[in-house]
Each structure stands twice: as structure tokens, then as C-alpha cells.
């Protein structure tokens, strides 16, 4: 019997890293550089699990064509896959706030997942330092996760920190305080990525797995890969 409190990622290694899958009732932050598979990850979790998906697309990164490709490659009904996703496209930080607030009334028992991709795009584009606004939006998402019993994935961008010489997540402390589970994606080589578990409610931090990006979406990397 499937554990309905966990959503599979479709990647055995990622599911094991996360203690069985993406948990309902909490916020999972996924961050990393461009083209490391963050959006594909969020889409795949929505595709492979029962329930509708509220997908807040702030960057125009959600691709119906890509979702259709993933569904078709897995022999899933493409039309049903597309119908599962309810897309919102806020054009600035204020619209993002309004959309997230509306989700409190929109998300019901038919939904299993909420995605904000990416959570910090407008914040970054507007050169904002309003950490309080992001914190308020995260509080709403926390409420939705708990009260509506859905999983919430917030995709985050990175910036180069000249002091430490490493890439860090935007609004690191604000998101770090509100997100219980944190995954970092990194590029290894063409098509192959690494997922690092930076924090988890009960899993040891620092664990990592390899995965690859294919027509199906994200897949486990086998030894011969």
C-alpha cells in the first residue's frame, strides 16, 4: 500500500534521499544553478502522483510541451497529464503575493502539490530587499501545506557570494528558516546531475545521489551510465 503522505519523485535514489519521497505538510526547497533539473523535478513530482498541481510559474519555465514529452515517454495519457496542472503566471512580486494568497481558497482535497518556480525570481529582478514579504508568502505556503495536507515545492535561484567564493541560495536565511527540507542540485556533466540533501527533518544531511535528465524527465543513474 502506498504511503499517501509521500509523493514519489520517480527517481529511486531521490526518494531514498528524501526518506521515501516529497512529504506532504511541509515545504521542500530545491535550489541550484540554471539547467540543473529543478523545474523538471517539480513537474515530474506532479506528473507521477495522484491529485492536481497548483503551479506558480514566475519565469515562464513551465513547458506544456516538455510535460507532454515526459508523459508520452512514460506511456501516460498526455491530455490527462496536462489537465492535472493549474498554472498561475504572476508578472511581479505583488502579483506573486496575490496568487499565493488566493491558493488558500483554490487548493482543496483534489490537490496533492503546490509548486512556486521560482520563488525568488521577481524578488531578484526587482532588486528587492523585502525579506519580510518573502517570509509572509512562505507563512501562507506553510499554512496551505499543513491545513490542506499537500506537498509544497519552492524552487530557488542562486547567486555568487564573493566573500565565500561559492554559489548560495537567494534569501538563504529567510527560506532556510521556513523550509524544513532542502535539496541542492548541481551539474556534473552533460545530462548528469547531483542532488545533495542539505537539510531534512529526520534524514542525515550531506547525502547525495546522481540522476540524469532524459525525455522521461529525471531518472536514476546506473553504474554503466
Curated annotation (Swiss-Prot):
Keywords recorded for this protein, A-Z: ATP-binding, DNA damage, DNA recombination, DNA-binding, Nucleotide-binding
A GO molecular function held by the record: damaged DNA binding
Membrane-spanning parts: none
Residues noted as binding ATP in the record, renumbered to the chain: 32-39
Pfam families for the chain: Rad51
PROSITE patterns: RECA_2
SUPFAM superfamilies, alphabetized: P-loop containing nucleoside triphosphate hydrolases
Any one of the GO BP annotations: DNA recombination
Summary of the function given for this chain in its UniProt record: Involved in DNA repair and in homologous recombination. May regulate the cleavage reactions of the branch-structured DNA. Has a very weak ATPase activity that is not stimulated by DNA. Binds DNA but does not promote DNA strands exchange.
Family affiliation: Belongs to the eukaryotic RecA-like protein family. RadB subfamily.
Protein name: DNA repair and recombination protein RadB
Species of provenance: Pyrococcus furiosus (strain ATCC 43587 / DSM 3638 / JCM 8422 / Vc1)
